[in-house]
Every structure is written in C-alpha cells, then in structure tokens.
Amino acid sequence: RNKFDKSIILTNSDILINSDLADIYTFHEKKKYDITLVASSKDFTIPYGVCQIDNKGYLKSVVEKPTYNFLVNTGLYILNPKVLKLIPKNKLYDITDLIMDVKKAKMKIGAYPISDKSWIDVGQWTEYKEATKKLNSY
C-alpha cells in the first residue's frame, strides 16, 4: 500500500503485449490519470443470424452473421499509488472492483488504445495457439 511513490504497471498473467510500455507510462503521467487501462479494438462475429424485433414483437430484420467492434480491456494497467489505498485487506478484490471504487471516488481513469495486432490473450485457446506459432517462428 504505502510502498510505492511512483505509478506501477500491473498486468494479467495471461497476456502478451507488444507495445512500448514507456509510451504508455508517459501517457498515464502526462494525463495525470489515477488508473490507465490499456484497451484494444476487437471484432466479434456472431455465428448466427441476429433478429431485430420491434416493441410489439414483429420481426424488423435478420442480419446474417454480423460483426461487431468493441473496445476491450487488454489486462494491462498503470496505477497511481494512491489508488492502492482503496484496496481492502484480506479480501478477494478484482481489478474491476478497484476501477469502480476509483470511479466512485471521482478519481481519473483513462484508456490507452493499442492495435488489436499488439496483444494476445493466451488465456483464450485460439489465441494461445496463435502465440505459440508466433513464438516458435523466432
């Protein structure tokens, strides 16, 4: 809790990120964020036709296998030391809990966007296989 006097980098254990951490850290400090969440654009295709209905239940349209784009959390964060004081002792407490508590405290949270090609979540089987292929090519 009181062991850090500078912002720290926190990362999930199942991600690989190919991005300049110094740039992310500088962005965090320059913007004076209490938390910076590194985010990436990710496309998700629904493997079915998606039905859209009106408020009376009538079918308006069917969109076949649409692709949606979301800004997703990569699992890499920069934390200002003062947010660490919000973490309760001896209690299971997720990073999303901390983010919500920081928001409730009206502290500043920002997002640093990176390319979808810049990170892999090896906790996902398909991405793990892709990471293995890439790492074996070196």
PLM ranges: what are they?
Residues P47-G49:
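Short beta-strand-centered segments that line the small-molecule binding cleft or hinge
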Residues K31-S41:
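A short, conserved acidic/glycine-rich loop-to-beta-strand motif
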Residues I53-D54:
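Extended acidic/charged loop-beta regions that coordinate divalent cations
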